[in-house]
């Protein structure tokens, strides 16, 4: 293994990412430089494609703003990427959802997917909140 390969492997291990699948609704935070100020710009949309290539892995996120479809490609291991969080899982029968480009309005919606893992995590959270011994006083 070369020195470059070792550095790439360390960078990948350094940034753990959530399990993002095609069809998920995600929120991505990007660091934007405006003059000498920095701010985090959020972008929320549906993942329509995922390209896995180690450090060069990317996701393509699509959203509709004022009736116009906007797609943006994000490099997952970019130093400007602040966070990636998923909001909702959706069912996808394809690896690439490019057919959503031709759909408008309600036609572009995807059916929500309910995972047992997500449901058990939510149930554990609800149980801990309803437990009187864990309440704040």
Curated annotation (Swiss-Prot):
GO terms for biological process: translation. PROSITE patterns: RIBOSOMAL_L19. The keyword Endoplasmic reticulum does not apply. GO terms for molecular function: structural constituent of ribosome. Keywords: Chloroplast, Plastid, Ribonucleoprotein, Ribosomal protein. GO terms for cellular component: chloroplast; ribonucleoprotein complex; ribosome. The keyword Ribonucleoprotein applies. It is found in: Plastid, Chloroplast. This is Large ribosomal subunit protein bL19c. It comes from Nephroselmis olivacea (Green alga). The gene is rpl19.
